[in-house]
């Protein structure tokens, strides 16, 4: 929505600013940063714990910070993978009511499609026969409407590149929760 203020021809700030794309933080840089933050407070965190954090949060800063903060609160001296798993599970349990509320706003087909995307992580061919058959999602024409509806509701995120579009569940924690459904 904010981007449209600057890129849509009928918007008030059309072409009044430069648009920059910000990539995710490099994984190695991020891992070192996490380790340094723990060390600064006289705590340790194992390499496999950091790897899991970055994988599970898809190196998205908001989710990475939230999980790291929770792990930091839980541990006294050293954070191991088991501590991260407990923290991740706790976060998902805390958000369950919110996630279930979203369920009530969707049709059964929208819900099932969202689960399918979450289980895949990233979908590059959202109407392909293989994807639709794997998750019993129906015909490509009806799935296109589902996809557009979930994009409008901002439950799915579309990422465009020169190679094409890819889709994932917008909220990483919601995606991880849906994987368990």
Give the ranges of each region predicted by the language model:
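C-terminal leucine-rich, beta-strand-based interaction scaffolds used for sensing/assembly
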Residues: 93, 97-181
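Short, flexible helix/strand-to-coil boundary loops that buttress conserved ligand/catalytic motifs
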Residues: 5-6, 34, 68, 160, ...
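Conserved nucleotide-binding/hydrolysis micro-motifs of P-loop NTPases
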Residues: 1-2, 25-27, 71, 174
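Short, conserved catalytic or adaptor-binding loops enriched in Gly and charged residues
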Residues: 10-16
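Amphipathic alpha-helical "lid/sensor" segments that cap RecA-like P-loop NTPase cores
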Residues: 35-98
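Conserved AAA+ ATPase "SRH/arginine-finger" region at the nucleotide-binding site
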Residues: 18-29
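Sensor-1/coupling segment of RecA-like P-loop NTPase cores
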Residues: 1-10
